[in-house]
From Swiss-Prot:
It catalyses: an acyl phosphate + sn-glycerol 3-phosphate = a 1-acyl-sn-glycero-3-phosphate + phosphate. Keywords: Cell membrane, Lipid biosynthesis, Lipid metabolism, Membrane, Phospholipid biosynthesis, Phospholipid metabolism, Transferase, Transmembrane, Transmembrane helix. One of its GO terms (molecular function) is acyl-phosphate glycerol-3-phosphate acyltransferase activity. GO terms for biological process: phospholipid biosynthetic process. This is Glycerol-3-phosphate acyltransferase.
Length: 215
C-alpha cells in the first residue's frame, strides 16, 4: 500500500507542468503555442526569458529529487528511491495535469540522480555543459549526456569509478530514462542532421551551423 501511495505521489509531483503553469499564471502565455510548443526548460527560456527558464529548470529538477527522497522521508527503507524517482519522470513526461503532453524528461531525470547519486550526476552535468559549449545545442547536449549515462552505468562500477558497485535498478532506470530522452528528441535529431537545430548564443558552435529561425 505504501509503495502504491509513493508511486502515485511521485507521479503527481512529476506531473506538475512547471513551464506551462508559469507561462499561464505569470506571463499569460501558453507555451504550447510558441517556439517548439514544448513545456520544458529550453522552450521556457526561449519564449519567457531567463527568470522563467531558471525557475522551470530548478522546479523540474526538484520534482525528481523530492520524489527520489520520498521513501527516505516517510521511513520506507525497503522501497527503492530510484524506482519512486522514475515515476516522477514519467509524470513529467506524461503529466495528468497537462493532457499527458509534458517535457523531454531531462531536468527531472537529473533531479532523480541528484537525489540518488549526486557525484554521478555531476559527471553527467559536466558532459552536458562541455557538449553544450562545443556545439551550442541544448538538444545535442541532452542526447550526448544520455548516451554517456548508459555507457557509464554499465562500465563505471567495474572500474569502481563514481558508482561503487552494480545496482541493477539504477542500471535499468538509467537505460529506460535515456531511451525516453532520446525518443522525446526525435524532432531535434532530424533538425541536427539537417543543420537547422535551434542554437543558444553561447559556446563554439563547432558544427558551424547558422542560427536557425525559431521553429
Amino acid at each position: 500500500m505504501k509503495l502504491i501511495l509513493l508511486i502515485l505521489t511521485a507521479y503527481l509531483l512529476g506531473s506538475i507542468p512547471t513551464g506551462l503553469w508559469i507561462g499561464q499564471y505569470f506571463y499569460n502565455i501558453n507555451l504550447r503555442e510558441h517556439g517548439s510548443g514544448n513545456t520544458g526548460t529550453t522552450n521556457t527560456f526561449r519564449i519567457l526569458g531567463l527568470k522563467a527558464g531558471a525557475a522551470t529548470l530548478l522546479i523540474d529538477i526538484f520534482k525528481g529529487t523530492l520524489a527520489t527522497l520520498l521513501p527516505v522521508l516517510v521511513g520506507a527503507s525497503n522501497i527503492s528511491p530510484i524506482t519512486i524517482g522514475f515515476f516522477a519522470v514519467l509524470g513529467h513526461t506524461f503529466p495528468i495535469f497537462a493532457g499527458f503532453k509534458g517535457g523531454k524528461a531531462v531536468a527531472t531525470s537529473a533531479g532523480v540522480l541528484l537525489g540518488f547519486a549526486p557525484l554521478y550526476l555531476l559527471f553527467l552535468a559536466a558532459v552536458f555543459v562541455l557538449t553544450l559549449y562545443l556545439f551550442s545545442m541544448i538538444s545535442l547536449a541532452s542526447l550526448t549526456a544520455s548516451v554517456v549515462a548508459v555507457i557509464s552505468v554499465l562500465t563505471f562500477p567495474a572500474a569502481h569509478f563514481l558508482l561503487p558497485s552494480y545496482d541493477w535498478l539504477l542500471t535499468i532506470t538509467i537505460v529506460v530514462l535515456a531511451a525516453i530522452i532520446i525518443l522525446r528528441h526525435q524532432d531535434n535529431m532530424k533538425r541536427i542532421k539537417q543543420q537547422s537545430e535551434n542554437l543558444i548564443p553561447w559556446g563554439l558552435n563547432l558544427s558551424k551551423q547558422q542560427p536557425a529561425s525559431h521553429h
